[in-house]
Swiss-Prot record:
Listed name of the protein: Potassium/proton antiporter CemA
Keywords assigned: Antiport, Chloroplast, Hydrogen ion transport, Ion transport, Membrane, Plastid, Plastid inner membrane, Potassium, Potassium transport, Transmembrane, Transmembrane helix, Transport
HAMAP family recorded: CemA_PxcA
Family statement: Belongs to the CemA family.
One term under GO cellular component: chloroplast inner membrane
UniProt KW Coiled coil keyword: no
Native organism: Ceratophyllum demersum
Gene: cemA
Highest rank taxon of the organism: Eukaryota
GO BP, sorted A to Z: potassium ion transport
């Protein structure tokens, strides 16, 4: 019975690692035809966000400026002007197709992410017993380390998350999440989140050190503060 109880969380741990990847891959493949058909038959002229509309308008303006430039610097025969118009028409059609495909991918990724988060939430709720065992494993492993190694591990983790160079990492991660969910890039929102998350984590860490580590292992707190200085 104890052996079975020890082995039970192992498949659960493997599922936590590989399940998001498997869900994303499978639902992307299965939902793509449906989303493509729905979006194309909807014939929507609405852009999913302002940044997409801005990019498309910029491309159209570039095409228009190229035509005006060609007409200004040289006097082309009518046949050449006609070829330019045909080329611009083809480029416009290609631009619309690319934008349409980008919209489909944004809807597909957003839907897949929502489904993945929902399934993982249910998976965590149903696997409460396995999570308790995994938590006991982590605590046992952590307590078996020396105080110096514990302090070094905490210091390394905090420097990665809330250290001097961490804002750039937070900016990349939040920007990637924004892009994956199809949201428009907003420097003000991203800067606000980057300046807020490290402060919250730093507050939680200090509270944990003061109320938990200081009671469980005072020597660890002393070593941590010495290394941090």
């Amino acid at each position: 019975m104890p052996k079975k109880k020890v082995l039970t969380p192992l498949p659960y741990l493997a599922s936590i690692v590989f399940l998001p990847w498997w869900i994303s891959l499978s639902f992307n493949k299965s939902l793509e035809p449906w989303v493509t058909n729905w979006w194309n038959t909807k014939q929507s002229e609405i852009f999913l966000n302002d940044i997409q509309e801005k990019n498309v308008l910029e491309r159209f303006i570039e095409l228009e400026e190229l035509v005006l430039l060609d007409e200004m610097i040289k006097e082309y025969p009518e046949t050449h002007i006609q070829k330019l118009r045909i080329g611009i028409h083809k480029e416009t059609i290609q631009l619309v197709k690319m934008q349409n495909q980008n919209d489909i991918q944004i809807i597909l990724h957003f839907s897949t992410n929502i489904i993945t988060l929902t399934i993982l939430s249910g998976f965590f709720i149903m696997g409460n017993e396995e999570l308790v065992i995994l938590n006991s494993w982590v605590q046992e492993f952590f307590y078996n380390l020396s105080d110096t190694i514990k302090a070094f591990s905490i210091l390394l983790l905090t420097d990665l998350c809330i250290g001097f160079h961490s804002p750039h990492g937070w900016e990349l991660m939040i920007g990637s999440i924004y892009k994956d969910f199809g949201f428009a890039h907003n420097d003000q929102i991203i800067s606000g989140l980057v300046s807020t998350f490290p402060v919250i984590l730093d507050t939680i860490l200090k509270y944990w050190i003061f109320h938990y580590l200081n009671r469980v292992s005072p020597s660890l707190v002393v070593i941590y503060h010495s290394m941090n200085e």
